[in-house]
Amino acid sequence: LFILVNIFCKGFSEYYNLENLLRQMPVYLAEVFLMIPMAYILVLGEIDISVGATVCLSATLSCMMCNTGAPFIVVILTALIVGTVCGAVNGFILTQFEELPPMIVTLATQIIFRGIAEIVLGSGGSISASNTDGFRLIGGKVGKIPYILFLVLILAVIFAVILGKSTFGRRVYAIGTNRLTAYYSGIHVKKIRFIIYTVMGTFCG
């Protein structure tokens, strides 16, 4: 995409434009980060629309923990645990009530997760972390390149290899192609779906 834009838009690769692109990169990389496990859900032929609410609830509770003076590692663990629990809730409902469409289930959990966040904050409330030193660390840069770019690239390669080359990945494709056939082939359909939705929640955290 960068090469194509550079061909058709003269001056795109000028220094000031590239510097601005690098400055804004962390915002977009956060979305790319969530797309990595979402790819697995899409391969299943499903969708999870509760990711925004999961991020919201995880951020709310982790910020509250941060404002109590908890160590940064505890703040991070809080976010990861909350996200994982939200993902596990989605996975549990979808695997126990397989007749329910994923879009409807995750729409419902989206409302629930966001509602919990609003109850915690109060109507129209907001919250911010009082101690941002730890967040500055993970949001740091190597030169002008943000750390998260390297994390996203590493995770993208790992998840792509797992999906394309591993037995687990082939099973995910089999479930997405025909869930019933995959089940009668001996694939643990419920287990795999539960794992994928739980991992999605962890990434949201």
Kindly give the residue locations of the regions a language model identified.
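Single transmembrane alpha-helix segments in multi-pass membrane proteins
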Residues: 3-10, 16-68, 93-98
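Small-residue-rich segments of transmembrane alpha-helices in multi-pass membrane proteins
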Residues: 28, 59-61, 108-117, 184-186
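Transmembrane helix-bundle core of multi-pass membrane transporters
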Residues: 100-165, 192-195
